[in-house]
Amino acid sequence: MKVGIYGQFYHTDSGKYIEELLIALDKENIEVVIEKNFLNLIHLNKTVSREYNHFSTFKELDSSYDLFFSIGGDGTILKSINFIRDLNIPILGINTGRLGFLATIQKEEIEQTISSIVHKKYSISERSVLCIETVPKSEEIGEGNFALNEIAVNRKNTTSMITIKTWLNDQYLNSYWADGLIVATPTGSTGYSLSCGGPVIVPQTRALVITPIAPHNLNARPLVIRDDTKITLRVSGRENFFLTSMDARIATLSNATEITIKTAPFKISMVELQPDSFLQTLRKKLLWGEDRRN
């Protein structure tokens, strides 16, 4: 078995868990390859002394990898897909962050997790991905034109609203007067979209949700659409530029830009340990069914 490991940051209190993970993988004779910057942080903090093979970019990974560990929070998983893209390498998130909707493995469960992986006591959840195209083409977006959670447009350098004209499959839908607009996948429905009043969508649902950010017209509600819908956006406002975000990546676009958002031709595979499920994660993370009044 061969695995990749990626982390954005190295926190002192996470050092022992990183060491525990590497030791557990070594015990099972699993080949480990670590992202170069994260490996440098591990060596700098003297977590381990031995050398590991490393990778730096998407081009250095291939289908020979059986698994990809993301160490951090949900933001780290979102950055992990920059390395995975369409390689179909399953991602498993070890949560050393806070909420952890995607990074569902707690750091205290590492040894048990490795045992489950070795004995194949896990399932794969296929998650849809969004891709964005712009006319004219944006160099800022480049090859990173995809998102696991959401693609959003936001105002820039102004406190005034922007107007987002929206078409679905070339049919006019609405002009949103708002701070911005979110197009989220089912995976992203528990993130930015949820905080703006959007619904929770079960991951395997073939749907997307369009959620306005602080709309001027309170009748502008989130809209759930089929995931094979082509979404076209045109932005106007007092400023000549606006922001577009693809998960954690941001690009500045001019108001002359036309955006097209579609479901990508590939999916991201997420590892789910038995008997974990999305519904259990909802109950744990959102405290559903718990009475905290006393």
Residue locations for each model-derived region?
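Gly/Ser-rich helix-loop-strand patches that form or flank binding pockets
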Residues: 79, 83-96, 101
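ATP/nucleoside-binding phosphotransfer catalytic cores, i.e., glycine-rich phosphate-binding loops
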Residues: 153, 169-172, 220-294
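Short aromatic-centered micro-motifs
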Residues: 166, 188, 244
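Short gly/pro/ser/thr-enriched loop/turn and capping motifs at secondary-structure boundaries
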Residues: 41, 97-102, 200-201, 216-218
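Catalytic core of DAGKc-family lipid kinases
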Residues: 98-179
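Short glycine/serine/threonine-rich phosphate/pyrophosphate-binding segments
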Residues: 14-15, 75-80, 190-195
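Gly/Ser/Thr-rich active-site loops/lids in small-molecule metabolic enzymes
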Residues: 174-219
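ATP/NTP phosphate-donor binding region
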Residues: 1-67, 108-123, 134-145
